[in-house]
Amino acid sequence: MKGKWLAVMLSAALLARPALGQTCTAGGEMDAATRASLGQVAQQFFAMAARGDVFGMRQQSISLVSSNFGAIEATVIQQKPLYAGAQAQVRATYLLEADGTQPIPSARFYCGVYGSSSFASFVIPSLPPGKYAVVILDIETTAGPYELTTILQQDGGAWKLAGYYSRPTTWDGHDGNWYLQQARQYAAQGQAHSAYLYYLAALELLPPVKFMSWPDLDKIYDEARKAAPSDFPVNGPVTMELSGKSYTISQIFPLEEATGLVLVIRYQSGDISDTAAALNDNLNVIKGMVARYPELRQSFAGVVARATEPSGRDYGTLLAMKDVN
């Protein structure tokens, strides 16, 4: 699944005590001055993004981020029209501290009181020791609600940008909880494939960042795993007979497009240089998949097939569901 999110499983033993040298303070446990200061820094980065001030953001980033700023810059430029004139509100704040002298292979932080609405966990690979903050902002834009998660690191007494994650919180006008409820309804109706795909949509939308989790989210990951159809490429590629031809399917996942929620199918192809042949294969895959699983007609507005070479180069075709026959 594109952008696959990490499921963090919390065991009772780990919850009983914090990881050695790794502590977290949730917003409700912070003193007011610290919480306000972190929120103000996050708001400043949002304001710079709304102005398109990528130079200023880069200057106020840690060295690792400033030397690899291309992805953040592209996101800021793309979203500037949405953020210009918008207002941001702080939803949640977390202060993370990691002791030591070497990067931590898998730093684990447990924040807040377990069972409370503010409890959260973070699992961050290869984290250098230091003091960090995670601030999540809610933003109302002309294109709907967005969330901006800023990762801050204390550097020389100042909080600098160490991560920037900005994205919509809805697909086709619906949030993650809506997709979760739809997934459960599809499961109850015996539409296992639509159910699983809607679980994936919910899990794309619910966590602000892929290294954050909480107990209810862990339960949803469990639900999704149990709902995974055996004939889908969940644990590796699967071979399907589609439109009279055998195809090796690598990935199947939902995605929002301008036309609404679409189903994306990635399959293996030795060569896509013959675009006419690739187009024909794409249409075979699209039509064959819908014929194999008719329930998809009600679940998706369209289907995308992407013939993918071993190099990763691909050739894609989008077909509206009304045109799949």
Description of each model-found segment:
Residues 7-17:
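Bacterial N-terminal signal peptides
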Residues 20-51, 165-178:
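Short, low-complexity N-terminal intrinsically disordered segments enriched in polar/charged residues
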Residues 47, 174-194:
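Alpha-helical segment of the N-proximal tetratricopeptide repeat
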